[in-house]
């Protein structure tokens, strides 16, 4: 079945959790605005986390002789006018926020292909952007595969080849082939440039062919693996009075259309024709005493009085109420952006009415990006399931009843309202241009710098057990630029249930040599512990972990001085810190042009003597 700009293949496949969910696993084995229609395809608002998870995924897939294609390169952070909008982004922001996930993926995993985006970057289409596709991707990072276009993203095939875009998708019916031949004949396209593009494509074809092997697979085993992954991705956001886990002896009201028809994947080109999609209603008898009422439909925002009345009656006869809420498919998808961060009004209204029955209410959310929660202070529990793949219902039920311990952590900040988002005044732009005016202050970098109250911070997530941290140590008190600093600490499970803890390592620049975020995630580790068990966790920090991108020197730079090393349970919950001194012999030179001041030159040891010799009598 062929459609415009896409191919829908009618095969059954196992649908694993979407990127919005897997990012919350913080398990190795960029989000700008919460309104972006394809946020469910993005791993995290944090470039370090996104890069590490992407590299691990690529290495795993390609170990099976299956190629990966990372996309969309670059600054493709909205669906509105995505075919033509120009993302206006300064180089420091690109290098620190929007490039690192791609850079890490390339350097650590070498994906077979990179897909360039539809949009323009600072005025030039990504498919024709030589600085992007050749200078940065190949020369700076060492990418060895081929670059392909997004579907129909080629504007000028010859310019694309010259820039480093090798493969056009889905093809032009021969029109661009003729343009290439003509350009070679006229001399505007060098034959060796064309040959290089062909060689890059053939190298991947040969790599696959030489390692091709027959594989057997089991949809049932893969479904169980999807359930296992989904359990690792679920984030417990609230658990007041230990309302969770549920007991099999309690009478539970199961409310909401998503309990019968879970939203488990995003719309558009990422859609999977799934093998099997169990729902909570089908599974309820395997877990406890549960009664179901629909309450609302899942295909929009239509209030239906009869459904609400039935839900309130069923809920009134229960001990606890579990509401399966979320965003309908039509609220977020490829090709358009969200208009707001709200759940459908019919869902919010029903949740509020349920909280007034005097029974504990737990909300399970199915959504691809943050939502506002006007009822957050009135419910007892919140379980963020995201778009958890075809086995998400099984995973959610396991979490609700304590058969699994939640260990997911938010890979993005949940602001209290849309207006708090740093891109609010500039998204989605106007007149085919969007200005990334917030610069490097994206996600928690912005909220933490502003000391802004948020609904739930980056890295946040609860467990059914408790963990304590102790004995934070670093292997050196002073390091040189070439050194790797090793950070170690002990983590103890002080609760009564086995669980996994996500230890987050943040770095804070105390040299004040440039405008920097309050702290940035620079490493993390997952550790599974039995009750009473203690393990030592060690993480490394290299020079890049301390550095920022200096656009004047065109390089990463970390000033000599003091840096704070912090261990946190989220970007806001910092448990312990220590300090290290970085000794950097490389001094930042002032930019010498018509705007340089004498004071700038005198502040730099490498230019001060020169200035003194010429100014002193």
Feature-to-residue mapping (PLM):
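Glycoside hydrolase catalytic-domain context in secreted enzymes
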Residues: 1-547, 562-567, 571
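Terminal connector regions
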Residues: 542-587
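Low-complexity, Pro/Ser/Thr- and charge-rich linker/hinge segments at domain boundaries
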Residues: 583-603
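Conserved, compact domain cores that house catalytic/ligand-binding motifs in diverse enzymes
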Residues: 596-617
């Amino acid at each position: 079945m062929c459609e415009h700009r896409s191919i829908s293949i009618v095969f059954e496949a196992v649908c694993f959790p979407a990127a919005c969910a897997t990012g919350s696993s913080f398990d190795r084995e960029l989000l700008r605005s919460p309104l972006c229609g394809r946020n469910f395809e993005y791993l995290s608002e944090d470039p370090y986390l996104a890069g590490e998870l992407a590299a691990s995924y690529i290495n795993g897939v390609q170990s099976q002789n299956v190629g990966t294609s990372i996309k969309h390169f670059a600054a493709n952070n909205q669906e509105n006018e995505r075919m033509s909008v120009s993302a206006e982004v300064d180089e420091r922001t690109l290098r620190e926020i929007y490039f690192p996930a791609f850079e890490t993926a390339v350097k650590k995993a070498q994906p077979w292909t990179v897909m360039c985006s539809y949009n323009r970057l600072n005025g030039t289409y990504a498919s024709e952007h030589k600085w992007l596709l050749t200078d940065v991707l190949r020369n700076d990072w060492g990418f060895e595969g081929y670059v392909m276009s997004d579907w129909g993203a080629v504007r000028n095939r010859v310019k694309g080849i010259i820039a480093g875009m090798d493969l056009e998708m889905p093809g032009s019916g021969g029109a661009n082939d003729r343009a290439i031949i003509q350009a070679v004949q006229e001399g505007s396209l060098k034959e060796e440039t064309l040959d290089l593009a062909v060689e890059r494509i053939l190298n991947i074809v040969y790599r696959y062919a030489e390692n091709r092997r027959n594989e057997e697979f089991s949809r049932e085993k893969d479904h169980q693996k999807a359930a296992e992954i989904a359990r690792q991705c679920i984030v417990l956001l609230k658990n007041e009075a230990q309302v969770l886990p549920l007991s099999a002896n309690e009478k539970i009201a199961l409310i909401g259309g998503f309990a019968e028809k879970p939203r488990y994947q995003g719309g558009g080109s990422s859609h999977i024709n799934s093998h099997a999609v169990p729902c909570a209603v089908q599974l309820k008898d395997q877990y406890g005493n549960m009664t179901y009422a629909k309450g609302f439909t899942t295909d929009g925002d239509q209030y239906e009085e009869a459904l609400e009345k039935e839900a309130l009656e069923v809920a009134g006869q229960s001990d606890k109420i579990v509401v399966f809420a979320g965003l309908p498919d039509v609220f977020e998808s490829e090709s358009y952006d969200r208009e707001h961060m709200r759940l459908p009004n019919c869902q919010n209204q029903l949740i509020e009415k349920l909280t007034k029955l005097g029974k504990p209410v737990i909300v399970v959310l199915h959504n691809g990006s943050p939502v506002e929660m006007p009822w957050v202070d009135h419910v007892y529990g919140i379980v963020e399931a995201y778009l958890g793949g075809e086995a998400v219902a099984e995973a959610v039920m396991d979490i609700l009843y304590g058969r699994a311990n939640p260990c997911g952590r938010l890979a993005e900040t949940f602001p209290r309202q849309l207006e708090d988002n740093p891109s609010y005044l500039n998204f989605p732009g106007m007149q085919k241009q969007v200005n990334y005016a917030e610069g490097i202050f994206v996600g928690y970098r912005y909220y933490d710098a502003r000391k802004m109250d948020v609904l739930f911070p980056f890295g946040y997530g609860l467990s059914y057990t408790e963990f304590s941290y102790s004995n934070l140590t670093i292997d050196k008190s002073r390091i040189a630029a070439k050194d790797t600093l090793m950070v170690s600490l002990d983590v103890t499970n002080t609760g009564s249930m086995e669980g996994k803890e996500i230890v987050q390592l943040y770095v804070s620049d105390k040299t004040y040599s440039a405008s920097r975020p309050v702290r940035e995630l620079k490493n993390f580790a997952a550790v599974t512990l039995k009750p009473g068990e203690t393990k030592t966790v060690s993480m490394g920090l290299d020079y890049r972990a301390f550095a920022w991108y200096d656009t004047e020197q065109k390089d990463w730079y970390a000033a000599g001085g003091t840096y704070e090393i912090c261990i946190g349970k989220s970007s806001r919950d910092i448990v312990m810190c220590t300090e290290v001194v970085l000794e950097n012999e490389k001094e930042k030179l002032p930019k010498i042009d018509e705007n340089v001041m004498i004071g700038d030159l005198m502040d730099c040891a490498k230019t001060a003597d020169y200035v003194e010799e010429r100014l002193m009598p």
